[in-house]
């Protein structure tokens, strides 16, 4: 069995994994996370009355931009040509917004980190745009929901490890 910690060389120092021999395949990753806030904050987001502008539109663009910049921010991530990034929002009409990012590529390595970074940046942007009226917002439950493609195959959050490829 090979060592699962592939980002270390034979001197136990960090390295970028060599993906030269890997096959190009279609790959998709979806991540999600939530931000909890005061009900009045969510009401103002819905009403479009935040001084900084359309919170969800700006957060959506920020998340897309973040996915495209992943290799500049996470040292061992490869520069991956993304073929799609989509951010969706849902909320409970009370105090929570959920952001979900789906990232796609046709490349030799996956886009899980791109999806996770997109979600985190989306949620941080919501925080930034609303912090003047609600500094008690909480970002949580950020995780990979699903990934598909590549040698490791399909992953679905919550599946038992033995059923994952």
Curated annotation (Swiss-Prot):
Name of the featured protein: Cyclic pyranopterin monophosphate synthase
Source domain of life: Bacteria
Gene3D superfamilies: Molybdopterin cofactor biosynthesis C (MoaC) domain
InterPro entries xrefs: MoaC, MoaC_bact/euk, MoaC_sf, MoCo_biosynth_MoaA/MoaC, Mopterin_CF_biosynth-C_dom
Catalytic activity annotation: (8S)-3',8-cyclo-7,8-dihydroguanosine 5'-triphosphate = cyclic pyranopterin phosphate + diphosphate
Top-level enzyme category: lyase
CDD domains tied to this protein: MoaC_PE
Taxonomic lineage from the root: Bacteria, Bacillati, Bacillota, Bacilli, Lactobacillales
Lyase recorded as keyword: yes
Annotated SUPFAM superfamilies: Molybdenum cofactor biosynthesis protein C, MoaC (SSF55040)
Family from the record: Belongs to the MoaC family.
Alphabetized GO MF terms: cyclic pyranopterin monophosphate synthase activity
Binding positions for substrate per the UniProt entry: 76-78, 113-114
Assembly information from the UniProt record: Homohexamer; trimer of dimers.
PANTHER family: CYCLIC PYRANOPTERIN MONOPHOSPHATE SYNTHASE, MOLYBDOPTERIN COFACTOR SYNTHESIS PROTEIN A
